[in-house]
């Protein structure tokens, strides 16, 4: 005969914390890293779930922006590389401020022309006007 305690255990769903929360990022691993990092004396169970959800959202947002940037490059095949990820992150206002001090390896620099170089001079040179 099953006791109430064993019946509850049998009724419980088995599976990872990520699957129970509907996340892709590993909640258990994030919680372990939070505990090992000693950011606080005590870490609640919902803290790891919340942090994993935030990381998953930011990753999905950056991936979506990167795919759009790679598709706009005009090439036939769309391939993500560190350069397209960096360009997408720098051109977005929110993610750009969040990743302002981050260096992505093998991504190069954001192309920009300084104002001093972009200034045009007053007269047009090179055109000869006919003096008839």
Curated annotation (Swiss-Prot):
Keywords in UniProt for this one? Chromosome, DNA-binding, Nucleosome core, Nucleus
The main place the protein resides is nucleus
- Gene3D superfamilies named in the record: Histone, subunit A
Q: What does this protein do?
A: Core component of nucleosome. Nucleosomes wrap and compact DNA into chromatin, limiting DNA accessibility to the cellular machineries which require DNA as a template. Histones thereby play a central role in transcription regulation, DNA repair, DNA replication and chromosomal stability. DNA accessibility is regulated via a complex set of post-translational modifications of histones, also called histone code, and nucleosome remodeling.
Q: What is this protein called?
A: Histone H2A.2
- What is its quaternary makeup? The nucleosome is a histone octamer containing two molecules each of H2A, H2B, H3 and H4 assembled in one H3-H4 heterotetramer and two H2A-H2B heterodimers. The octamer wraps approximately 147 bp of DNA.
**Any coiled-coil ranges, and where?**
none
One Gene Ontology term, aspect cellular component: nucleus
Pfam (any one) = Histone
Q: Where is the signal peptide?
A: none
Q: Where in the cell is it found?
A: Nucleus; Chromosome
Q: What domain of life does the UniProt record list for this protein's source?
A: Eukaryota
Instruction: Tell me the protein family, please.
Output: Belongs to the histone H2A family.
GO MF:
DNA binding; protein heterodimerization activity; structural constituent of chromatin
Disulfide bridges in this chain: none
């Amino acid at each position: 005969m099953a006791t109430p305690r064993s019946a509850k255990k049998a009724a419980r769903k088995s599976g990872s914390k990520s699957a129970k929360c509907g996340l892709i990022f590993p909640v258990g691993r994030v919680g372990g890293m939070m505990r090992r990092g000693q950011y606080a004396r005590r870490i609640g169970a919902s803290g790891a779930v919340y942090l994993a959800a935030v990381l998953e959202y930011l990753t999905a947002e950056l991936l979506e922006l990167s795919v759009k940037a790679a598709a706009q490059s005009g090439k036939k095949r769309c391939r993500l590389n560190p350069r397209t990820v960096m360009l997408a992150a720098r051109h977005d206002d929110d993610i750009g401020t969040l990743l302002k001090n981050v260096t992505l390896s093998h991504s190069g620099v954001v192309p920009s022309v300084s104002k001093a170089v972009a200034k045009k001079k007053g007269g047009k040179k090179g055109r000869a006007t006919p003096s008839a």
